[in-house]
């Protein structure tokens, strides 16, 4: 039986490692997934923003999700990226995720075409109707421009398959407002590494992080400390991580995180255009953050 309990703790939005010619490196991907599981990451999110989904072909997107499910092999859950600004494309992605055994799907707010709240409602309801998988709404107005209002989220939550949200707004009033508006247990996950402790304090359940690609053990430890009531320990870990959190978003994700992984010898820094490797100032900041964590000499 599928695990339908709430996601908690440190979840990782996985990078998609690539060879220098831009082909996906599935061997390295498997090693990164093993590293995540061994470090205590509670779930994996392939083929999202951090996984460069906008520049993956449909075939590649499907292979990345299937590869993650196969490699995880039930040890942790897989929440597959299934977002598109085309409802029909998102439906196909969600159906594929279900067909290969993903545990849930993460569907971003449609970007660029700027739908109204009614358009957002119909978009997400159509996807939720198309598959039995639990679905998470991904709110990231910095990339999508539009956002789901709390009222629309409450309407969407009436669908039994819509079970939670990834909230990258960094608005700490939002998880409280959503909790009060939604008339069922609703799984709220932060999508902002820097503000995760504030999000947890506001009643959130966990974080889908980027930094956890680099230091999955520290991110998992921070969440465990919080869950066990060791608040001072959680704060200390988060303070220690803050320079790396900051550096990860000095330029467009996933440029910085891939560079950081390359510095640790875990994958190369190859990105697909229009994304490019970080500039020198960003590279210096990442190196300094890694040294502060004693990960570089």
UniProtKB/Swiss-Prot annotation:
Its EC number is 4.3.3.7. Pfam families: DHDPS (PF00701). Pyruvate binds at residues 50, 208. Homotetramer; dimer of dimers. It comes from Gluconobacter oxydans (strain 621H) (Gluconobacter suboxydans). The active site is at residues 138, 166. Keywords: Amino-acid biosynthesis, Cytoplasm, Diaminopimelate biosynthesis, Lyase, Lysine biosynthesis, Schiff base. SUPFAM superfamilies: Aldolase. Transmembrane segments: none annotated. This is 4-hydroxy-tetrahydrodipicolinate synthase. The lineage of its organism: Bacteria, Pseudomonadati, Pseudomonadota, Alphaproteobacteria, Acetobacterales.
